[in-house]
Amino acid sequence: MKNIETDYLVVGAGAMGMAFADELLMRDRSVRIVMVDRHATPGGHWNDAYRHVTLHQPAAFYGVNSEPLGPGGTYLASGAEVLAYYEKVLAKWEKTGRLKFFPSCEYVGENRFRSLMNRDREFSVEVKKKTVDSTYMNVTVPSIRPPQYEVAEGVRLVPPNDLSKLSETPSDYVVIGSGKTGMDAVLFLLKEGCDPEQIRWIVPNDAWLIDRATFEPDRFTKLGSQLSEIVEADSLDEIMQALDAQEKLLRLDPDVWPSKYRCATVSREELAQLRRVKGVVRMGRVRKIDSNVITLEEGTIPTGPETVHVDCTADGLAKRPVRPIFEGQSITLQSIFVCQQVFSASFIAYAEFRLADDAKKNALCRPIPHPESVPDYLVTATRTSENLGACLQAFPIWFLRSRLSIVNYFGLSAMLRLGLRERKLQPKANAKAKALLPSEFSE
């Protein structure tokens, strides 16, 4: 076993691990970091994603603080661009000698890791400061795990990665799953020339969708957050009705009221394409696929040997139990701004750099679990507003200069106007949320 020494041991070279390490290396010119990942290259789940994947939110707010990604605006970087970007960032920091990356290695606990390529290569790390777990959010994609339903022998079932590799043209397609991956699969099939009638789409639950245009700074400052709708409503349904009327949130089908919210983001053009598919099956989750029938929770639909079934059911971001982010010699990276993992990780690193006391750091960096249901929308919206207000008050200059922060694109005057508006609404919104969902705010 080889012994090595470092200040920080970062487990995972995915988006959150890279954002954390980059911020710390940028702020502290003496810090040393060892980074370990099971993949051969940095980028985490991007290494396993399908070829046609792109960012769902603008590249301007993604990646790390020290390096721009894409040309700016609402540009959506491809998966290949993201992977090349992370390799560039890694190479930059490796050249300084302050970051050492150990690819194709598995962390086994107690500051030890081993090579996945050579069983005789094991390492023990003397960590001078802290061990950082950037894998806790547990991002999964369909290509790295089997489907969670029975599949009979001979059924043509593929992950989205294999759609571009089909050797025989199928008669039709069944896309299973309604999250971001399912939407991407449908959009890919349509873009490649499939007729909408060739596609059946199993949508277990409809979810509210975010309009990507709301990330444009001008529109964001005009619309603000959703606090005004929360304050003025008397029920959760009224909140969602108001957001629907203002088109701050969108629906896949205007005639179906969503029951889920998972931060899925689409453009108006993409939504129009998705609505071309009329063969939407709303019978719950798939239980089993046989050679001629698909069994769902609430019924069955026919299938056939020439049908390609596309598994898009991996829970990309699970709703994990909340843990304190700072605990002695450990840091567990989690979102502190809803659905903004890399921005959260970068700020957590900045808090680690600026503050010495764990209690103060945890007071600023309160974890927000990934939302799943409509009630989660209300909880995460109000808690994000609280966190953002506290963090902005503590370190306003960081927010103005961070490329991962939408505040960076506002300018000072717009930020002040928005901040004043939100500060007035926040106490009322928090009180309303606690009244509507007391069990979620019991602490």
Positions of predicted regions on the chain:
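Glycine-rich dinucleotide-binding loop and its adjacent helix/turn
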Residues: 72, 78-85, 133-193, 199, ...
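Rossmann-like dinucleotide/flavin-binding elements
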Residues: 20-28, 162-209, 343-393
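Extreme N-terminal leader/targeting segments of oxidoreductases
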Residues: 1-8, 26-31, 125, 135-164, ...
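Glycine-rich active-site loop/strand segments that organize a redox cofactor
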Residues: 38-88, 160, 202-259
